[in-house]
Design a protein with these regions (language model features):
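Nucleotide-activated chemistry modules centered on ATP-dependent adenylation/adenylyltransferase
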Residues: 1-229
Length: 229
């Protein structure tokens, strides 16, 4: 059973989603990453009774079992025209200042409104950047056709809030959150950021002309592989 404070947050999240739907007739995208926060916002959308289209943008470097979980959750899978390894072959590894991997594989418009599982508690930077439960964003040039309203229903949720909600609603998570015996071992974080070095090695194997001395993945690509949200 949820504590009173978390129950209030759940109610506020649901009201936010419903308020967006009241002023918008179309379907709202759920930016589904396969991570625990995505499963939470998907559940909230169901409880809110809104019209949504849950979409997983396949980055071509998905953690084992992720695509199976995405399909099991009934989420639509979109595939980019290129792959991460093709981009690396063309441009080398992305960096903090060159985020072409996210731009090509993950950050593009599908619908006019998008629900995202961003939380302030995830990092100090996110706590500084995200101040409101909704935000307007442009993908590409600042033109009306590129405009998206992003909605953050769990922006103020803590790691404990997410954990308790998952337990209370008995949500099934992606395989990466469980050990070999089926016990939930990583309900607070998938911990997949530690695999960025393995991904780098895989990229070097598949694209041998890339130097071993490459400084590695940008945070955005580590996040793609890590499914933190």
């Amino acid at each position: 059973m949820l504590n009173e404070q978390l129950q209030k947050k759940v109610s506020q999240s649901i009201k936010l989603l419903q308020s967006v739907q009241k002023r918008y007739d179309g379907e709202i995208e759920i930016a589904y990453s396969g991570g625990k926060d995505s499963d939470v916002i998907l559940q909230l959308a169901k409880e809110a009774g809104i019209r949504y289209r849950a979409i997983y943008k396949n980055t071509t470097i998905d953690p084992p079992g992720t695509l199976g979980h995405v399909r099991e959750m009934g989420v639509e899978i979109l595939r980019a025209k290129t792959s991460f390894f093709h981009l690396v072959a063309q441009k080398g590894f992305p960096s903090r200042f060159s985020r072409f991997c996210c731009e090509k594989l993950k950050e593009y418009k599908v619908l006019d409104k998008s629900i995202i599982g961003v939380r302030k508690a995830e990092s100090r930077k996110r706590n500084e950047i995200y101040n409101e439960p909704t935000k307007c964003r442009y993908y590409g040039a600042k033109k009306e056709e590129n405009h998206v309203e992003q909605i953050y229903p769990i922006l103020e949720w803590t790691d404990e809030d997410v954990r308790d909600f998952i337990i209370d609603r008995k949500l099934k998570l992606a395989p990466i959150y469980y050990d070999s015996g089926g016990a939930n071992r990583r309900i607070e974080t998938s911990g997949m950021y530690v695999l960025s070095s393995r991904l780098k090695a895989q990229a070097h194997y598949r694209v041998p002309e890339i130097s071993q001395d490459s400084k590695g993945l940008s945070p955005c690509c580590a996040a793609i592989y890590g499914h933190a949200s």
